[in-house]
């Protein structure tokens, strides 16, 4: 009888293990290119950015899905940094080589080079088969691509991305930028739910620059997003690291990760606290069809 009991326990344990699925997502902050960086990367034949990622490439590549905020355009020459960013194509090649899987393009610099910058960036990303979300050539393009659904390791992750503004520049017809608009976001969340995702993650370009604490508007919007059905929130824009929190859901056992700002990842900013940022790992576990946050952690860079 004891042997039979042990066999049953082993079988139950084995079945439970086989029913478990896990995925690790890695989020980083702003991928930027200022004039000094562009100059430093210049070689006789072009640009070389391998040094930017050589110490963290392994960690990025180990994640099942690595996501970063592309806060430049790839608008072609002349290459420039602040205030109107256009980075060399080699910067994107290095980002892909470092192991990034998805890039966010909804930020206040996505229209720095106007229609050409938005469309050339999208074309180059597509040519490298690099999924991105937040900016679109046309409304039809947005309808086909958004929300971005990522499928890996048996998981379906719906990724949303929005920006507070584009530095006063309006998108040229027929280009589309995802702005923070609760009416539109609510509609997008409903579309995301129809995709039957295991998790909905909202990436928000929000808040006030250089402030180490989140603004009340960020907190209010985070509360609203969770109430609407978003599972986790990743923030950018302030260029400094802001607090992170794990919030227990009020209605069921789920927990929600809220990162108000990851700060800078690659940049040449020199203001206080802008010379680095955070990488956040989010591990999800699915058991018997139910997805929960297994763990989360961060490292400063």
Q: What annotation goes with each model-predicted range?
A:
Residues 19-301:
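Acidic, metal/ion-coordinating pockets
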Residues 1-20:
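Bacterial Sec-dependent N-terminal signal peptides
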């Amino acid at each position: 009888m004891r042997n039979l009991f042990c066999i049953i326990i082993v079988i139950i344990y084995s079945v439970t293990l086989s029913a478990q699925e896990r995925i690790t997502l890695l989020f980083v902050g702003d991928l930027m290119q200022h004039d000094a960086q562009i100059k430093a990367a210049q070689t006789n034949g072009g640009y070389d950015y391998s040094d930017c990622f050589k110490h963290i490439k392994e960690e990025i590549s180990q994640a099942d899905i690595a996501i970063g905020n592309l806060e430049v355009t790839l608008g072609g020459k002349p290459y420039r940094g602040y205030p109107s960013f256009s980075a060399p194509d080699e910067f994107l090649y290095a980002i892909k080589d470092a192991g990034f899987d998805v890039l966010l393009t909804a930020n206040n610099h996505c229209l720095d080079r106007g229609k050409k910058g938005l469309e050339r960036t999208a074309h180059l990303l597509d040519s490298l088969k690099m999924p991105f979300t937040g900016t679109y050539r046309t409304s039809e393009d947005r309808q086909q691509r958004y929300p971005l659904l990522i499928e890996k390791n048996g998981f379906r992750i719906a990724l949303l991305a929005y920006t507070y503004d584009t530095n006063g520049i309006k998108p040229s017809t027929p280009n589309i930028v995802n702005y923070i608009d609760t009416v539109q976001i609510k509609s997008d969340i409903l579309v995301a739910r129809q995709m039957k995702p295991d998790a909905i993650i909202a990436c928000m370009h929000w808040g006030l620059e250089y402030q180490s604490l989140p603004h009340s508007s960020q907190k209010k919007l985070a509360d609203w997003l969770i109430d609407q059905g978003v599972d986790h929130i990743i923030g950018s824009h302030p260029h400094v690291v802001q607090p992170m929190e794990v919030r227990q859901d009020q209605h069921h056992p789920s927990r929600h990760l809220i990162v108000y700002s990851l700060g800078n990842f690659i940049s040449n900013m020199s203001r206080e606290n802008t010379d680095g940022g955070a990488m956040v790992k989010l591990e999800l576990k699915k058991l018997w069809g139910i997805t929960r946050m297994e763990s989360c952690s961060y490292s400063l860079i």
